Amino acid sequence: MAATAHWRQLTCSGDVPTGRIGHTLVTNTAEDTVYLYGGVNDSNEQNSQYLQDFFAFSFADKSWRQIEMSGEVQMPRAFHTAVFYNDQLHIFGGCNGRGRFNKLFSIDPTGRCSMFSPPPNAKVPLTRYCHSATLFEGKMYVFAGKCGGRNSNKRLKDMMAFDFATKTWIEVEQVGADVPARSAHAAFTCGRRMVMFGGRSSEGECCEDIYHFSYDTCMWQKIETNHGPLFGRARHSVVVHNGRVVIFGGWNGKKKLNDLIFYNMDSETSEVVHDPDETCPSRRECHVAVTCQNTMVVFGGRFRGNFMNDTCELDLGTKSLKDYCRDWLLQHAVLVGDSERTSLPRRIVDYMDKWRALVAPELQHRIPAPPSDSSPLMWIRSRMPSAR
């Protein structure tokens, strides 16, 4: 039986942002607000309108609110990246009609901007756009992207990490599989690894490969899969929710898409998901999606010259027992002990053993000082909704 999903096309109130592409969305820690920054509306290619506006979307009442920016306000830009850390958005890179950027700055929820100024002669990333940025243990990892002009095929495959504690950039020495240069790909953190796939190659073709990158060993591993045609796209949106990757839309080198794909990390299986109510958003590329309270929120994108400003939601479901077990395993990075094995269903133990592959080998036998919630059952019970 084919998987189904139900989309909601929202009628939002307030200061709804104008249609755009190349913007960023991030969710705050409380998961009650989604922030939008920047982008471009270039329906008139002779006069592209690059944006530097800042909006907050209230998940509860489905309203948008524009926030006036202050402080060290930066130039308009699109195809930058953003992560949310320490109650701030951290924006890196991007481009506009005048050039490309490699500066890092932050925006707090009130709209105040602060610029990061590296020391003289410090190593910093190259200018870029259509790159990716992931967050792991207080560091932002920037990978690949495009560094040439609008019609250039020059793409990167380097990686730099920004340490928020020391406020320094670190060049990451990548080992393992040789990942081809690309832009407009997708990358996200899952466990102690980055998962990266898709994008556009230096030859201008859509990449069908998928890779894992270990944050602990800096090693890339190519994942052999028969799902290449599904992953072969660029300018798409991706979120990860409870071990399941949710892919929506994009461009496959021939046409714009509005398909929805679920890829299960544990079983390495994928399925195309259908909406029986036929409320799926229209075909689009260069849109953005985030998760908020077990829901995927999608905004914007482009199709046939139309720059959209619709807001759509897709329910992703609440956590299962298996999901809580995975969270415990990835947080503690230890083996499931004999006593825990006897207190959990066999299928759950097998599932957790499989997810140990997301923990670096040198950490698999690390036993932390026993916290009060070191037992998986205690930890899970304290976090399930019925326990609160």
Which ranges hold each PLM region?
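Beta-propeller domains
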Residues: 1-13, 37-65, 108
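Cullin-RING E3 adaptor/co-adaptor recruitment helices
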Residues: 2-6, 291-297, 301-388
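Short loop/turn motifs that recur once per blade in beta-propeller domains
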Residues: 11-20, 68-77, 96, 117-128, ...
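Beta-strand-rich domains and repeat architectures in extracellular enzymes and scaffolds
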Residues: 13-45, 76-80
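Beta-propeller and closely related beta-sheet repeat lectin domains
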Residues: 21-26, 76-82, 126-133, 158, ...
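Entry beta-strands of beta-propeller and related beta-repeat scaffolds
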Residues: 31-37, 88-91, 139-142, 193-196, ...
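Short, solvent-exposed loop/turn segments at conserved positions within beta-propeller repeat blades
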Residues: 44-51, 97-101, 150-156, 202-207, ...
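Beta-propeller blade signature
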Residues: 50-62, 102-112, 155-168, 208-219, ...
